[in-house]
């Protein structure tokens, strides 16, 4: 059976299962070249499938990750001919509005500068009394059709947090595990977190812990003037290292973030988050009931008035010491809360779990918090899917159908299979390059030159893991400023990540585990030897690399170590500010031409500027 997984919403994504195994997954932004894109046009799905010698006509089932508890009550409102509300719902992520009861011929509606809605792909649904098919809280079936294709597909709609849970558990090596999902819900009625247990092919949610840290972090990011939380939350994490944690936050974080604090606002998360931010910054007054009600009803005028009244930081103010200190408090509260909540999960599951933890959801892109979870809770092992944000839910919904519904035996995945699950592109039209010489590339790196590195299939998730990377030497601190200002064109305070030979990682960093997907920030043991690869607090978001994982890049780092004595390179995503990571060879060539870098490597060829 061939299963196509789809996620519509910010970080829209596609995933493919063939012969009982996840073989491919990708964020749509890589194809559309629009950051955080939410559109799922048919042409991009076809383009993705073509990379795996598959067509839409070959597909047997389509799965969707969504908020099933929101959709279920609407199932009996429309007749089978007009019952497209559920599919319209998948096209939006920024409001609770019923968009239309006809999708055919509808155009995209621009929500923001980076988000679109109402994909044209879905034409009609066939829904004879769907309510009778809704037998669980986590998924339901309907038949779906795609415009222009004379075929009816089996469709499975899987709860958003269940999709997160499935993405991490079913790709782990664990027979049983506790699962923690956490993100920022766009809908005030929806859960922002979940506690699950996984055993064999089964996943079961046993508690909704009501944690809202993702929403809190996103709101803080926007009101500190950094930008929309869905895009810029990582910048807040970088900025926090320059701040000082206040005694107020240190003394009160547990009380502020306890579930009883949330419940006293009658589960109106926006009021709670306003209150929590006020405790920290004093700049975010509690919004009046009338105004808040208007916001929840999506009244744009009231929303705009509220934004002005709250007086958020300007973008210029976002790097003031006051903003840095607030960012430090936000990060501290997030880290301590996640450790506390994860330990609660351990206590609630220790009677039947052997110490395994799986996590997923955008909140767990917080690499600083992940290190604290890894080292300060009683769990022995921790697994994360590389695409742990919403882009991973396309794969999660497909895996849920495969293992939970079809009861197909679980598969083992290598690190490389999970890291590099995107499309492999044809590069035969690039005929003018020189044969790749890793010794030459290592020499250039050792002389503080910057390399565009493009190799094989694209990465799964938001991190550059060695197939779409800028590579540079970590030896000189000036490299950090050069790459931020002249290559990446981004904020000066953003750090760069090191990639290190796995067997040498403990010589350079305080860690006793591998982090192949660059999802942990760890302390550095030798920060003065690699100043360009550590942050202001001497931490680093490390990627560990084995020869089995990526032999070509591993060999390059070995050669660099022979010349420099350092088994580490800077590894940052092959893009510039505001753009997705490059996808195709042509994308890489275009970026090389407009970037202040010295060498371009595409698979087994290289190009040297001004050679």
Q: Where are the regions a protein language model picked out?
A:
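Extreme N-terminal starter segment of soluble prokaryotic enzymes
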Residues: 1-4
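Flexible beta->alpha loop and helix N-cap segments adjacent to enzyme active/binding sites
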Residues: 7-28, 32-35, 54, 77, ...
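Conserved active-site "lid/cap" helical segment
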Residues: 12-13, 18-145, 243-329, 341-342
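Short glycine-rich phosphate-binding loop at a beta-alpha junction
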Residues: 56-67, 155, 352-362, 452
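A structural motif corresponding to the C-terminal end of an alpha-helix
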Residues: 139-154, 563
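Short acidic-aromatic active-site loops that bind/stabilize oxyanions
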Residues: 155-158, 316, 320-336, 546
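Phosphate/ATP-binding catalytic cores across multiple sugar-kinase/actin-like superfamilies
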Residues: 329-353
